[in-house]
Amino acid sequence: MRIIMPVEFSRIVRDVERLIAVEKYSLQGVVDGDKLLVVGFSEGSVNAYLYDGGETVKLNREPINSVLDPHYGVGRVILVRDVSKGAEQHALFKVNTSRPGEEQRLEAVKPMRILSGVDTGEAVVFTGATEDRVALYALDGGGLRELARLPGFGFVSDIRGDLIAGLGFFGGGRVSLFTSNLSSGGLRVFDSGEGSFSSASISPGMKVTAGLETAREARLVTVDPRDGSVEDLELPSKDFSSYRPTAITWLGYLPDGRLAVVARREGRSAVFIDGERVEAPQGNHGRVVLWRGKLVTSHTSLSTPPRIVSLPSGEPLLEGGLPEDLRRSIAGSRLVWVESFDGSRVPTYVLESGRAPTPGPTVVLVHGGPFAEDSDSWDTFAASLAAAGFHVVMPNYRGSTGYGEEWRLKIIGDPCGGELEDVSAAARWARESGLASELYIMGYSYGGYMTLCALTMKPGLFKAGVAGASVVDWEEMYELSDAAFRNFIEQLTGGSREIMRSRSPINHVDRIKEPLALIHPQNDSRTPLKPLLRLMGELLARGKTFEAHIIPDAGHAINTMEDAVKILLPAVFFLATQRERR
C-alpha cells in the first residue's frame, strides 16, 4: 500500500476548492425594464445579480436558494431563502431592482418548502409543501390565499391574466398539466394517455403550449384550458420536427409573440424560435430571453461551467474562468450506449481524465433524482474526480429523463432493481472497453442510494463506494417526510410497503464487503439523517470498514462553497486513498 503524501493531498484540496469556486451563472429573465436577472454561484454562495451589459449588481444581502420566475420587465425580484439551516423551510423576500440589498420579508408566507413560483409584478403565485399538504398559493394585495390543494409535487410554469398553468407529479410517475385561476382558485388537471407533459407556457391566445414526451420522442402541443382538448402545434419552420427531440426542457413566449423552445436529444440541446433552429454552442441551454434586440440564454457543457451567452454568436456575456490546468484535466467526453441485462441500451456519458492512464481508475458517478439526467453539462463532482486522476462514467439508468417516457417510467415500482442492473452494466462496460483498471462508485441523493444498493446487492463489483445524502430506509424516510416527499415515495415504490422494506439498504448491511464513505448533511429534510445514524450503528456492530462525515448546519441542497467543499473534498480524498490500496 502506498500512502498519499502531503503534497498530493494538498493538490487535491487546491483543485477541488478551485473547481467549486469557479463562477457559474444561470439566466432567470429580464427585469427593471432591460436588465438581465441572473442567479450565480459566486462570492462563495448562490446570489441574485442584475446585469446591464457592464458590471453585475448583487441584489440580496445574504445567500439565497433561488428566485421566482419574473415576468418581463418587472421592477422587483422575489428571493427564496432557507431560514432553517438547510432543512428547506423557505421564506420569501422582495427586493426592488432600484434598491439592491434592501430586502423585505414577505411575512404572510410562513416557512415551508417552496417548490416553484412566478412573479407578475403584482401577484406572486407559488407552490409549497408542508407536513400535511402541497398547495398552490397566491400573494397579492388581498394577502396570502390558498388557490388549490395539489395531489403531489407541483410547479408553476406561467401566468397570463388570471390563467395559471403548471406541471405536477400527481400519480404513477407521469407528469400532468394543471391550470388554476388567480382570482377564483380551483384546480383542473389534464393528463395524456400518450405520455407526460413537460415545460409549459401560456400563448397570447390563452391556450397552454406544452411539451409532450411520449415513449421515445417529444413534440409540441396546445391544450385548451376550457375543455382539455389537445392538438399538435404547427410551427412556421420544420427544423424542430426534423430534429426529432426526445425531451423538451424549456419553452416560453418572447415579448414579440414568438415561441422559444429548448429541446434535447442524446444529452445535448438545441434552441428553436418558431420552430427554426438557432445556431448555439454545443452542450446544453436554459431559458431564452429577448434582450436589447438579441437572444440570450445560458450555456454549459462537460468542459464549460454554466455561463450566459448571446445567440447566434455564442458570445459570452457572463462567465467564470476555468483555470487552464483544470481544463486540461478533462481530456474529452463522449456518449456511449451500454447493453443492460434485458437488452436495453443505457445512454452513458464518459468523461476521460487527462491525469489518468488508460486503462486507469474509474468512478461510476450516479446522478440523483431519479428523474434527472447526466448530459453534456458541467458537473463539479465529475470535474473534481477527473482532476484527481479518475475517469468518470455517468449512466442514465432507467428512470432518467431525456430519453423518452418509456425509459423514465421503467423505474416505477422497482427501485434498487433494473436501474441497479443498468449501473452495473455501465461499470462492466468501463472495464471491458479498456477504460477502467479498477472501479469505484459514487453518488449523491438517489445516486447515494445507488451506491448503497451496489455495495449490498453487487458485492465485488466495485473496490469502494461513496454515498452522499443517501436513502437508507424507505419506510423511516416516509415517516419523516413532508406531504410532497411522501407522495414521491408512494409513486416510486408503487405504494408497496414490501418494496420499501426489501429495497432499503439498512436491511442488507451484512452483504457489504467493500470500504464505504458516508457523507450526509445534518439538516437534510429530503433524505433525513436519522436512518443513516442507524446504518452507522449496524456497520459498526458488524465490523464493516467505513468512514462518516456529517456536515453541520447543512441541508440537501448545496448552496455555499463551504458546504460544497465539506461534501466533495472527503469524497474525493476517500477515493484517492482507496486507489492507493493494492
Swiss-Prot record:
GO terms for cellular component: cytoplasm. SUPFAM superfamilies: alpha/beta-Hydrolases (SSF53474), Peptidase/esterase 'gauge' domain (SSF50993). The keyword Transcription regulation does not apply. GO terms for molecular function: omega peptidase activity; serine-type endopeptidase activity. Pfam families: APH-like_N, Peptidase_S9. It comes from the Archaea. The active site is at S445 (charge relay system), D524 (charge relay system), H556 (charge relay system). Gene3D superfamilies: alpha/beta hydrolase, Peptidase/esterase 'gauge' domain. PANTHER family: DIPEPTIDYL PEPTIDASE FAMILY MEMBER 6, SERINE PEPTIDASE S9 FAMILY MEMBER. This is Acylamino-acid-releasing enzyme. It comes from Aeropyrum pernix (strain ATCC 700893 / DSM 11879 / JCM 9820 / NBRC 100138 / K1).
